[in-house]
């Protein structure tokens, strides 16, 4: 993290992705579980802004945010849905364990979602792979993402859920893409 006198820290660029990434990752939560408010990171300022209120009656089924110092094909940090018992406030950060990835297309563009469990939540920390979740939980997540933009006349297609090993590969790839895009060559870390 950078704490310069008079300079705010940027949650995407200044927070560490986790000492044990990709097995455990730091996550910044933008949207709490149960919210209809679509908060989003303003990439220029690092502040959280209200992007929109969801047009339908659905609410976010779990805490939703991103992994710091990651970059995906859509130009955003890696999205993460963190399963845990309680909602948390926007822009807090926590430690989570990736257990899967949901492959998704948002208006024809790849927009995969990392699925993780809070590392210290007694109800969820024992899960190591998405296949261990009850089928209803996966159906709930899939239905939310298929429906949450329908009333805006935007198409979202959920392709498939993949397990923990694929999730860790997605984390490594997004960490490396961030390094290639934002970090000078001689200062880069390579995640293998």
UniProtKB/Swiss-Prot annotation:
PROSITE patterns: PPASE
Top class in the EC scheme: hydrolase
Catalytic activity from the UniProt record: diphosphate + H2O = 2 phosphate + H(+)
Residues involved in Mg(2+) 2 binding: 79
The protein's name in its UniProt record: Soluble inorganic pyrophosphatase 2
Keyword Mitochondrion part of the UniProt annotation: yes
Annotated positions binding substrate: 38, 52, 64, 148
Activity vs pH: Optimum pH is 7.5.
The UniProt record lists the keyword Aminoacyl-tRNA synthetase: no
Species: Chlamydomonas reinhardtii (Chlamydomonas smithii)
Alphabetical list of HAMAP family matching this protein: Inorganic_PPase
Family: Belongs to the PPase family.
């Amino acid at each position: 993290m950078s704490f310069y006198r008079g300079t705010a820290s940027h949650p995407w660029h200044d927070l560490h992705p986790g000492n044990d990434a990709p097995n455990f990752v730091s996550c910044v939560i933008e949207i709490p579980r149960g919210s209809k408010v679509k908060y989003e990171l303003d990439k220029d300022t690092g502040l959280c802004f209200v992007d929109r209120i969801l047009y339908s009656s659905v609410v976010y089924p779990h805490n939703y945010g991103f992994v710091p110092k990651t970059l995906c094909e859509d130009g955003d940090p890696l999205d993460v849905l963190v399963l845990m018992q309680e909602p948390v406030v926007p822009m807090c950060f926590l430690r989570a364990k990736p257990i899967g990835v949901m492959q998704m297309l948002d208006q024809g563009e790849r927009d995969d979602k990392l699925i993780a469990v809070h590392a210290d939540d007694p109800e969820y920390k024992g899960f190591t792979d998405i296949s261990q979740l009850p089928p209803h939980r996966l159906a709930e997540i899939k239905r939310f993402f298929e429906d949450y933009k329908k009333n805006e006349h935007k198409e979202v297609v959920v392709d498939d859920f993949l397990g923990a090993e694929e999730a860790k590969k997605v984390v490594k790839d997004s960490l490396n893409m961030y390094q290639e895009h934002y970090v000078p060559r001689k200062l880069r870390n390579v995640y293998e």
